Curated annotation (Swiss-Prot):
Keywords: ER-Golgi transport, Golgi apparatus, GPI-anchor biosynthesis, Hydrolase, Manganese, Membrane, Metal-binding, Transmembrane, Transmembrane helix, Transport. Its cofactor is Mn(2+). It is a multi-pass membrane protein. The gene is mppe-1. InterPro entries: Calcineurin-like_PHP_ApaH, Metallo-depent_PP-like, PGAP5/Cdc1/Ted1. Metallophosphoesterase required for transport of GPI-anchor proteins from the endoplasmic reticulum to the Golgi. Acts in lipid remodeling steps of GPI-anchor maturation by mediating the removal of a side-chain ethanolamine-phosphate (EtNP) from the second Man (Man2) of the GPI intermediate, an essential step for efficient transport of GPI-anchor proteins. This is Metallophosphoesterase 1 homolog.
Amino acid sequence: MIWLKNLRVPILLAIILVVYNEYFIFFIAFSSCQWPCKYGRCSESSVKAFMISDTHLLGKINGHWLDKLKREWQMYQSFWISTWIHSPDVTFFLGDLMDEGKWAGRPVFEAYAERFKKLFGDNEKVITLAGNHDLGFHYAIMPETLEMFKKEFRRGLIDEMKIKKHRFVLINSMAMHGDGCRLCHEAELILEKIKSRNPKNRPIVLQHFPLYRKSDAECDQVDEQHEIDLKEMYREQWDTLSKESSLQIIDSLNPKAVFGGHTHKMCKKKWNKTGNSEYFYEYTVNSFSWRNGDVPAMLLVVIDGDNVLVSSCRLPSEILQIMVYIFGGIGIVILAFILISRRVRIFKRRPSYSLLMYRSQEKCD
């Protein structure tokens, strides 16, 4: 108990360090993000949406339990704290929800889906898309995996929905290979049906793969922290959709904005429509997980009439968190050592002082 009293301050500081690093850094990060509303205030008819991609919940093959615990805690904190601060109308998860869904049998897939729902919720405000890690790339997709995803996440090849009268079209990127297979043929028929209706209001297109581009050299900066990778070249149908499929989506849907993920890098690209003055922006969202980069991100999107307003929101840096733990931990250990050393010196002095007092009293007698 004596030693514990001396360590009260270091123990209190250790608790504060953990609380700060596991809670307050998320509040600080998300408090600095803002909805990009016109004139600083969003109208009641506007839709406020989070765009999140590539959560990659780890599985048994590639995921160590400690890595899994750390990443899922980071994403859980990020999602719920940002939701509490900003209150979005809807959150879109743009694919690769799971890391090993493509290899999972039914029991494992169901357990995967249950973990995702526990982390991010299971209600009408959480809308998911499939990615290649959920189903596999085009030639690796099994009908059973496709059905399991449809059952667990209520998502077809192409879905159309309305939120506050704003249209959204959700596309399974792996069904846009364009090779005439049953999957692609079914997706193309749905696109043609949407095109034939020719609705007046242009939709927001959501998918996992970005539209075709050779590299991120074609991108504009999304924010000040965005460093554009000029070296990596993208492969059609692996890193992006093919050029033909991209043009088919643009021609069929005439989108007012496109959002995707997959590359684990941010991108903002302007697309000009041939034959008229219309254009739209495509946004690629960074991964939401620390496992795929030091500073994950999401997008805060406001759809207000024909305007699609976008701002990026960076999550806390994992390296910064680690450095705070290291230097804070070293400081606490040094403080504890000083307090213990001081206690030991005081404890050693007491016997000699008592003995001296005792002998002095004997001489006086």
